[in-house]
């Protein structure tokens, strides 16, 4: 660089070009497409047949086996009726995002300025998830025969939201012979609410949590300002000074209402401990 000496290299940004005001803009559209081709999951009939052949519905105690066989027949009726839920696609979407870049510059041989702004909106493949980023900057420079002033201001903003539909692995574990809604079209909170049959807890429907007022967001703001001055009263003497300011703030906001399925096992003395913030 122009200031390199004794093994020190100083990198400076490109100065705005002098002359008339110049404006430029670029934009693009982005797609986030889920790829499920690597997932080979069983359909409802295959899953039920695997459970039967593995002895899942067998029990040495006659009264237990009768109940299990009854449950098997209930599920088989659902399968024969055409129930075959492909859970992997339920929380997914094709995310459509966009990016924009704007630049403004101008000035004269003594005073030059430029301003830039970039906005990027990324829509995730999980429903209602996103990440939005804004970067802006203003560069100013002023030159005389003896003085040079430069100021660079940059601002970065970011906001992200996780999907209220939970995590994708929750849907991979769901049985295809379960239905997402009841006979009235309402999203189920639990599947087959048979506590004894499932051995301890109700299997929950992660789609139900998306109907609640859940929240999981984060954001941050970065601001940087660098000022430099160069004074050269004579050819053999140069005085340089720099001053910089940097600040960052960040926040997270996570809320789960008491009705969230993660608190389904909170009973008796823990009932009023449901919910988190």
Tell where the protein language model's regions lie, with residue ranges.
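A beta-strand signature from Gram-negative outer-membrane beta-barrel systems
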Residues: 1-24, 97-99, 112, 118-120
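Outer-membrane beta-barrel initiation region
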Residues: 90-94, 104-108
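Short, glycine-/polar-rich solvent-exposed loops and beta-turns at beta-strand/coil boundaries
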Residues: 1-5, 93, 129-132, 165
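Surface-exposed loop/interface segments of Gram-negative outer-membrane beta-barrel transport/assembly proteins
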Residues: 17-83, 124-129, 135-224, 240-277
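Outer-membrane beta-barrel channels and translocator barrels
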Residues: 18, 97, 108-109, 143-147, ...
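Membrane-embedded beta-strand positions in outer-membrane beta-barrel channels/transporters
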Residues: 8-10, 99-101, 135-137, 224-226, ...
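An active-site-proximal structural segment forming one wall of the substrate-binding cleft
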Residues: 237
């Amino acid at each position: 660089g122009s200031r390199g000496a004794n093994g020190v290299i100083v990198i400076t940004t490109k100065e705005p070009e002098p002359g008339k005001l110049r404006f430029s803009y670029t934009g693009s559209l982005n797609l986030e497409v889920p790829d499920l081709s690597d997932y080979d999951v069983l359909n409802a009939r295959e899953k039920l047949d695997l459970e039967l052949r593995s002895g899942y519905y067998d029990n040495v105690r006659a009264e237990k086996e009768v109940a299990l066989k009854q449950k098997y027949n209930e599920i088989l009726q659902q399968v024969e009726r055409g129930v075959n839920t492909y859970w992997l696609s339920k929380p997914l979407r094709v995310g459509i995002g966009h990016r924009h870049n704007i630049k403004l510059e101008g000035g004269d041989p003594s005073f030059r300025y430029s301003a830039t702004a970039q906005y990027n909106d990324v829509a995730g493949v999980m429903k209602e998830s996103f990440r939005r980023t804004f970067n802006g900057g203003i560069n100013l420079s002023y030159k005389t025969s003896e003085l040079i002033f430069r100021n660079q201001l940059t601002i970065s903003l970011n906001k992200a939201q996780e999907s209220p539909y939970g995590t994708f692995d929750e849907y991979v574990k769901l049985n295809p012979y379960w239905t997402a809604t009841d006979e009235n079209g309402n999203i189920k909170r639990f599947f087959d609410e048979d506590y004894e049959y499932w051995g301890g807890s109700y299997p929950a429907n992660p789609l139900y949590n998306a109907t609640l007022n859940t929240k999981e967001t984060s954001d941050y703001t970065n601001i940087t300002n660098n000022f430099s001055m160069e004074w050269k009263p004579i050819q053999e003497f140069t005085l340089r000074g720099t001053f910089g300011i940097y600040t960052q703030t960040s926040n997270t906001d996570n809320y789960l209402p008491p009705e969230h399925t993660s608190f389904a096992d909170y009973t008796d003395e823990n009932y009023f401990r449901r919910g988190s913030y």
